[in-house]
Design a protein with these regions (language model features):
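Extended, compositionally simple hydrophobic/Ser/Thr-rich segments
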Residues: 66-68, 72-78, 82-112, 116-121, ...
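ABC ATPase A-loop
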Residues: 59, 77, 95, 171, ...
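Glycine-rich hexapeptide-repeat left-handed beta-helix
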Residues: 15-18, 104, 110-116, 120-226
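Fold-independent oxyanion-binding glycine-rich loops
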Residues: 50, 62, 69, 86-87, ...
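Short, conserved secondary-structure segments in the cores of folded domains
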Residues: 54-56, 74, 92, 168, ...
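Long amphipathic N-terminal alpha/beta scaffold segment
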Residues: 31-80
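Terminal amphipathic alpha-helical/low-complexity segments used for targeting or macromolecular assembly
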Residues: 1-51, 193, 199, 208-226
Length: 226
């Protein structure tokens, strides 16, 4: 399930050529910088509501709203009819499709968001690919750097694959949904249509159309008289 077509509808991005020659989807992450060097043609066609910082190497499509306080450092390509909300921080090497949301106090770097991907509140998205109509609940963090030295590994069929990447956050397949305040640890791969429940710390691979639940034990007792 690690091939680009296993996770993503490549028709839902104008940048599908990023995946040409990729055996595994994560290989596209190391190609984003070079892709932007070749394809980025700076231009602003957006509406700005207030004061925002927009760097020189940025393209923003028609109908996109950039709210007050946003910082788009670039290089970055942002598609049509997106919302870049208050205090969003879009760093280096970012490609955002059409109809996407990068919300309040979100930080994004070295990332591709397919069309209609949504990260609306207090999210960190580093070195990741977010599929068509994928969604991050409020406070979701995608961790991209492990504490122990070495490349990030991915397990497949009981074997560990070396991704060759020191920084690698997550791959979210089309329609994947991550609950509020969950953490996706480095190298997480979430299949199409799968769900991670809120407050989970997830590591590893979740197949498509699955639900990962955090069954925390709770106890309810009678309140004693004061």
């Amino acid at each position: 399930m690690f091939k680009p077509a296993d996770l993503f509808d490549l028709a839902q991005t104008e940048h599908a050529s990023l995946f040409e020659g990729c055996q595994y989807a994560w290989e596209a992450l190391s190609k984003i910088e070079g892709y932007l060097d070749t394809h980025l043609r700076p231009g602003l066609h957006n509406h700005c509501d207030g004061v925002a910082y927009i760097g020189e190497k940025v393209f923003i499509g028609q109908g996109t709203l950039v709210e007050d306080g946003a910082m788009i450092k670039g290089p970055a390509i942002i598609g049509r009819n997106c919302q870049i909300r208050h205090n969003a921080y879009i760093r280096e090497q970012v490609i955002i499709g059409d109809n996407c949301i990068v919300g309040n106090s979100c930080e994004v770097k070295n990332c591709l968001m397919f069309n209609d991907a949504v990260a609306p509140h207090f999210n960190y998205i580093g070195d990741s690919l977010l599929g068509y109509k994928s969604h991050l609940g409020a406070g979701v963090k995608i961790s991209n750097f492990k504490m122990i030295p070495g490349n990030i590994m991915v397990e497949m069929d009981g074997k560990r694959l070396d991704t060759g990447l020191r920084k690698f956050g997550a791959l979210l397949g089309d329609g994947a949904d991550i609950g509020c305040n969950a953490v996706l640890n480095p190298g997480s791969i979430i299949g199409r249509g799968s769900i991670i429940y809120p407050n989970m710390s997830w590591r590893g691979v979740l197949a498509q159309n699955m639900i990962a639940k955090n069954k925390e034990a709770k106890e309810v007792v009678v309140r004693k008289s004061m």
